[in-house]
């Protein structure tokens, strides 16, 4: 434990918290335009073709973001909304695209966890 004198000479320095999603700049979401829509493969031990998009945001950042759910209608120049949240097995992917917002449609025929995928409530049959 330091003495008062030592603390006067060199005060305690608090740790600087680094943002996990710097491109959002403390906003909950950001709008952007897709510059490239493609698939990529995850790290070992997983194997798949994950759908991702390179997005140029309104604040000038260019980020890679993940397109969740089965099937999508994104193309180059689609306007999308991105939120934070990384994909653990895709290095460099620190953002998710919000389904059912702007140009990206919700997941078709989704019955459970619909709010996460922008799916409307199915008509009662």
Curated annotation (Swiss-Prot):
Keywords assigned: Methylation, Ribonucleoprotein, Ribosomal protein, RNA-binding, rRNA-binding, tRNA-binding
Modified residues (3-methylthioaspartic acid): 89
Pfam families in the record: Ribosom_S12_S23
Superkingdom of this protein's organism: Bacteria
InterPro entries per UniProt: NA-bd_OB-fold, Ribosomal_uS12, Ribosomal_uS12_bac
GO CC aspect terms: small ribosomal subunit
UniProt xrefs under Gene3D superfamilies: Nucleic acid-binding proteins
Swiss-Prot/TrEMBL GO biological process terms: translation
GO MF annotations in UniProt: rRNA binding; structural constituent of ribosome; tRNA binding
Family (UniProt): Belongs to the universal ribosomal protein uS12 family.
Entries under HAMAP family matching the protein: Ribosomal_uS12_B
Subunit structure: Part of the 30S ribosomal subunit. Contacts proteins S8 and S17. May interact with IF1 in the 30S initiation complex.
Known function: With S4 and S5 plays an important role in translational accuracy. Interacts with and stabilizes bases of the 16S rRNA that are involved in tRNA selection in the A site and with the mRNA backbone. Located at the interface of the 30S and 50S subunits, it traverses the body of the 30S subunit contacting proteins on the other side and probably holding the rRNA structure together. The combined cluster of proteins S8, S12 and S17 appears to hold together the shoulder and platform of the 30S subunit.
Record's protein name: Small ribosomal subunit protein uS12
Organism for this UniProt entry: Cupriavidus necator (strain ATCC 17699 / DSM 428 / KCTC 22496 / NCIMB 10442 / H16 / Stanier 337) (Ralstonia eutropha)
Underlying gene: rpsL
């Amino acid at each position: 434990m330091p003495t008062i004198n030592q603390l006067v000479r060199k005060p305690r320095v608090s740790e600087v918290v680094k943002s996990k999603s710097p491109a959002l700049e403390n906003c909950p979401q950001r709008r952007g335009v897709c510059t490239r829509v493609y698939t990529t493969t995850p790290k070992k031990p997983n194997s798949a073709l994950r759908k991702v998009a390179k997005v140029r945001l309104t604040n000038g950042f260019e980020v890679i973001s993940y397109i969740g759910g089965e099937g999508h209608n994104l193309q180059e120049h689609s306007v999308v909304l991105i939120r934070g949240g990384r994909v653990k097995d895709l290095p460099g992917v620190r953002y998710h695209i919000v389904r059912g917002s702007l140009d990206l449609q919700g997941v078709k025929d989704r019955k459970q966890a619909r709010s996460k995928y922008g799916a409307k409530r199915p008509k009662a049959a």
